[in-house]
Amino acid sequence: MLKLGSLELGALPRIAVPFSDRAGRGEVQALRRRGLDVAELRVDRFADPAPARVLAQLDKFTGLPTIATIRIRAEGGGWIRGEAERLALFHALAPRVAALDVELAAGEIRAEVVAAAHQASGLAIVSHHDFGGTPEPGELADVVGRGLEAGADVVKIATAVRDPADVRALASAALAHGGANLILIGMGEAGVATRLLFAALGSLLTYASAGEATAPGQLLFDEMLALMRRLFPAYDAAKAADLDHLDPV
């Protein structure tokens, strides 16, 4: 079973929330105390991504497994600087976080980011985003295969969903792989249900918002948490037990 830091992935669905540098420690820790599972550090949304400033932000996430993401503009992120600078940030972050998320399309730096994650005993998430639509099942299977060949521990696929056929295409990817090593998300209003449905099909993480959505169709964290606890009894029981023994960092 995969572990994100000390958190097991796969047995239960998990909720991740993306944060920029605007989030305060109090806000992050309040979400942790309410049941947040995973924090995603969106370095591409930082006002100043200087390495020292980025690393200083990590203290906010004490007690939470953290994914470091530096998303390029072409895949919905805010990173417009050079790849050498992005790679240097990934190397600086690797020993301090539980996982690095890099795009399948990242080209030359992808292999180095994957290696940096593994050298630091973390997970490598290789991601693919399509804001234009959802590919056919065969194309999705190809993305999964290429991600795993690239050394991914987890392949993340997020596509724009327009109709039920798109939902079925994404669901087919989950069913074909038993959900193992996958994060699948249907973006947009038509894809909101996938953020819950795919957890039942084995998708390892679903993403929610603390107020500033980073993708179309993201639900607010408290709304997502309530739905997950209502729809997944095992998650509800585990969450109740976790909160009873929460370390008050």
Give the label of every model feature segment.
Residues 19-34, 81-92, 136-146:
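Short, acidic/polar
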